[in-house]
């Protein structure tokens, strides 16, 4: 017998930015009953699941999945003080669905993680890292991705996916809000999964900006796997520095600046 998961109603509402009143209007289920279903006071029946699925045009199977809910605070995307809560919830809900889908596929295919190296090089320091330390970790990361120590990274997405990191576009970017979300990438450094996910938000950005965004999230996955106690500002600063050091290693930067100095 199929069991329906009340947490999926909450997840759907976060993604679709739907209030209980709006769901009542579309399904005919009272707000009181929806609240009781969500809080597991009354059973979530197939009849109710079918009404909700029809209302939001979701497959019925969506409401029987059992992914562990992800608190928005565990994700690494940035937001301004004026970003609306419903936009934050939509981004985190979409990421949760993506990560859950990737996890199920990995389990069915019996895929094993090839990312032990992240655990090996992830820092445990309780204080912000020096630029020298971040440069060193960025260089180690390039080697684990089978990249040269210097020179451009031709395809960031391919380099990440080759080692077992899924890179996926997202759509919950807050375009309908007066205060758009300030983030362009999302990840969850502490999530225990064989295939971690980097999500990037669908804006009309240049290729260089997208490359930076993806490596920025890779930086979070490595630098903050064991250091989530840092402030958000500290984590963002470190991930920025990591992305810069990964995409333009120190030796490349020195060579470029030395050449420019000689020309002038």
Ranges and model annotations:
Residues 1-264:
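Short juxta-domain linker segments that transition from a proline/glycine-rich
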């Amino acid at each position: 017998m199929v069991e329906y998961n009340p947490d999926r109603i909450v997840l759907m509402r976060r993604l679709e930015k739907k209030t209980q009143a709006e769901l009542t209007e579309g399904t005919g289920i009272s707000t009181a009953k929806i609240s009781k279903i969500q809080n597991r006071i009354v059973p979530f029946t197939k009849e109710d699941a079918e009404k909700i699925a029809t209302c939001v045009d979701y497959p019925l199977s969506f409401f029987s999945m059992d992914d562990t809910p992800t608190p928005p605070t565990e994700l690494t995307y940035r937001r301004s003080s004026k970003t609306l809560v419903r936009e934050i919830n939509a981004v985190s809900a979409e990421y949760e669905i993506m990560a859950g889908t990737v996890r199920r596929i990995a389990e069915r295919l019996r895929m094993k993680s090839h990312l032990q190296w992240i655990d090996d090089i992830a820092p445990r320091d309780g204080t912000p890292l020096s630029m020298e330390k971040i440069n060193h970790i960025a260089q180690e990361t390039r080697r684990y991705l089978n990249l040269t120590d210097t020179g451009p990274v031709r395809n960031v997405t391919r380099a990440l996916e080759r080692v077992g990191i899924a890179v996926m576009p997202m759509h919950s970017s807050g375009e309908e809000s007066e205060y758009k979300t300030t983030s362009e990438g999302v990840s969850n450094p502490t999530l225990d999964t064989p295939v971690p996910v980097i999500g990037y938000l669908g804006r009309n950005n240049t290729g260089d900006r997208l490359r930076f965004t993806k490596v920025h999230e890779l930086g979070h996955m490595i630098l903050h796997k064991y250091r989530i106690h840092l402030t958000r500002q500290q984590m963002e600063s470190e991930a920025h520095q990591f992305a810069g050091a990964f995409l333009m290693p120190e030796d490349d930067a020195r060579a470029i600046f030395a050449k420019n100095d000689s020309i002038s």
